[in-house]
């Protein structure tokens, strides 16, 4: 739990009045919202998160963040320039900057990413370094969070890094 103004530090204009709550979690999935969550309304290829803001509030959201002009006049809906960037900053703030506490290695390319990351993990494990591999083969070693995608979304990724 963290105070809402600390989660949204550097994201919002200081003149915005926020509810006085402790944030329990962050998500862009209205079905995952629980009491005290902040809901981020991502617009996707097939769905628009703005259509689910009402559901998020019914499930307990304390605030919704959007980059849509249509909804900013609603109570506890805040407009930002880019909701995806705001989500990344909020995740970093909420989880106390876990990306600064670990070494991250990204592997890109058409072929060989899983093989390369598996070999690299083996080398690092052999030198007694703590490792975490995230990719098409899942998350190694296993963690309690089960992302629904090959690459975890920003919310799952920060929870995993935490």
Where in this protein do the model-derived segments appear?
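N-terminal leader/targeting and accessory segments in enzymes
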Residues: 1-89, 93
């Amino acid at each position: 739990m963290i105070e809402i103004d600390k989660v949204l530090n550097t994201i919002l204009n200081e003149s915005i009045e926020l509810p006085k709550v402790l944030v329990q979690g962050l998500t862009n999935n209205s079905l995952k919202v629980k009491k005290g969550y902040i809901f981020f309304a991502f617009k996707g290829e097939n769905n628009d998160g703005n259509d689910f803001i009402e559901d998020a509030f019914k499930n307990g959201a304390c605030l919704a963040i959007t980059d849509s002009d249509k909804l900013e006049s609603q109570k506890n809906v805040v407009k930002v320039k880019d909701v995806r960037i705001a989500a990344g900053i909020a995740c970093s703030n909420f989880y106390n900057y876990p990306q600064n506490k670990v070494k991250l290695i990204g592997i890109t390319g058409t072929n060989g990413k899983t093989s390369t990351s598996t070999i690299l993990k083996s080398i690092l494990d052999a030198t007694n370094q703590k490792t975490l591999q995230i990719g098409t083969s899942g998350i190694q070693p296993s963690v309690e969070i089960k992302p629904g995608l090959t690459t975890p979304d920003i919310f799952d990724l920060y929870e995993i890094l935490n």
